[in-house]
């Protein structure tokens, strides 16, 4: 998905982990991802050059950022989704 920062209007490439789209996320990040489950909770482990990131279900994986992840409530306030590229 293509998102833009509400403040700077910079393009952000991100995908939301919904608990079932492991192949989409793996293709998006270009590395192997691991699905972790415990009881009814599902997480995604993504390996990056900064180390492993644990993404909760509903969380976002963001390309080209040091943290590489974003919480749901932060994403809604900081970014907006667009269907077209705007530079």
Where are these regions (language model features)?
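Short, compact, well-ordered microdomains
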Residues: 50-87
